[in-house]
Amino acid sequence: YDDLALRTAGTAVFDIYFINSSSVDPDLTFAYGRPSDVPVAGDWDGDGVDSLGVQRGATFFLRNELSGGAADAPFTFGRAGDIALTGDFDGDGADSIAVVRDGKTFVKNTLVGGGADSVLVFGRATDTRVVGDFFGTGIDTLAIVR
């Protein structure tokens, strides 16, 4: 099951609610990143458990634990202002980052800096991209919402 992570607006505080918990209070609370960072979630190390990270400009700071602390995988990819997507785009069992800019989606299959492994021209620049394993293959793909 997926759990729910909420970040309090204007802060860097994350509240984690475990779906199988009967509590109405957060099961876990911690601070990570800066209030202006954009949160991202994924299974960065392929252990089957999603954790959090943040996007700050074109730099991603990813953690493999649901806790504060130093990033396990900081790297720069894309440009400031890009919209981040996460998913297992190559089917290796670990999530990575894609960024959307001007109607193009730039996919990086590893958590290291550098150029995109693939560039997808799909939909219109104004479309919203969503990620999922829509075919049940273990590989995430894109869909658009218009």
Predicted segment positions?
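Trp/Gly-enriched beta-strand/coil motifs that build multi-repeat beta-propeller-like domains
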Residues: 1-146
